[in-house]
């Protein structure tokens, strides 16, 4: 179940707000410029699907986003618990960073935790299958896929080169709850 938990930048143990209601989550995030929507991820992808299979199954969703925002490229990130690079990838994504473009993800399997550092608050968004999130360009954030990752998401980019991060050097991510 998707969830949003909001923390103060200075108080990492007691949430200011929490909800698992998709409409409430969307309202809170939209007020901060973050797009959050529930889409249908209803295609049977089989076990450990190839990127091409995922793209073909959800080309209609990609086309919708491209038509809306003029995105130039897309790919698929799919990680499972048996991935030999899971620890290195988790460590990389857990560092607070920004992008020069929106970070758009459509989760078609599994879950991951986007943590957005907006002003003096941290918004932890548990994204699951059927969730579309678009983090605005320049928003400091990090992503936690957990110690045993299990997700597939379509990534949509303005930049044809794909995922390019500018790391902030802030260790704030270390202070907040993570996925197990």
Swiss-Prot record:
The record marks 102 as: May play a role in transmitting local conformational changes. Binds 1 Fe(2+) cation per monomer. Binds 1 nickel ion per monomer. One of its GO terms (biological process) is L-methionine salvage from S-adenosylmethionine. Keywords: Amino-acid biosynthesis, Dioxygenase, Iron, Metal-binding, Methionine biosynthesis, Nickel, Oxidoreductase. The keyword Metal-binding applies. Fe(2+) binds at residues 97, 99, 103, 141. Pathway: Amino-acid biosynthesis; L-methionine biosynthesis via salvage pathway; L-methionine from S-methyl-5-thio-alpha-D-ribose 1-phosphate: step 5/6. Its EC number is 1.13.11.54, 1.13.11.53. It is an enzyme of class 1 (oxidoreductase). Its cofactor is Fe(2+); Ni(2+). Signal peptide: none annotated. InterPro entries: ARD, ARD_bac, RmlC-like_jellyroll, RmlC_Cupin_sf. The record marks 96 as: May play a role in metal incorporation in vivo. One of its GO terms (molecular function) is nickel cation binding. It catalyses: 1,2-dihydroxy-5-(methylsulfanyl)pent-1-en-3-one + O2 = 3-(methylsulfanyl)propanoate + CO + formate + 2 H(+); 1,2-dihydroxy-5-(methylsulfanyl)pent-1-en-3-one + O2 = 4-methylsulfanyl-2-oxobutanoate + formate + 2 H(+). Coiled coil: none annotated. HAMAP family: Salvage_MtnD. Monomer. Belongs to the acireductone dioxygenase (ARD) family. This is Acireductone dioxygenase. It comes from Enterobacter sp. (strain 638). The lineage of its organism: Bacteria, Pseudomonadati, Pseudomonadota, Gammaproteobacteria, Enterobacterales. The gene is mtnD.
């Amino acid at each position: 179940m998707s969830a949003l938990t909001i923390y103060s930048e200075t108080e990492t143990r007691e949430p200011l707000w929490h909800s698992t209601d998709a409409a409430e989550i969307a309202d809170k995030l939209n007020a901060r410029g973050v797009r959050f929507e529930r889409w249908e991820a209803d295609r049977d992808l089989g076990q450990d699907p190839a990127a091409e299979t995922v793209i073909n199954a959800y080309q209609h969703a990609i086309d919708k986003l491209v038509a809306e925002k003029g995105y130039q490229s897309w790919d698929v990130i799919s990680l499972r618990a048996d991935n030999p690079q899971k620890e290195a990838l988790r460590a990389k994504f857990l560092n607070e960073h920004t992008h020069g473009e929106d970070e758009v993800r459509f989760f078609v399997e599994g879950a991951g935790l986007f943590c957005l550092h907006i002003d003096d608050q941290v918004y932890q968004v548990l994204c699951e299958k059927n969730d579309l999130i678009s983090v605005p360009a320049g928003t400091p954030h990090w992503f936690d896929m957990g110690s045993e990752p299990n997700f597939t998401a379509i990534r949509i980019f303005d930049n044809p080169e794909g995922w390019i991060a500018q790391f902030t050097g802030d260790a704030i991510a270390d202070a907040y709850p993570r996925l197990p």
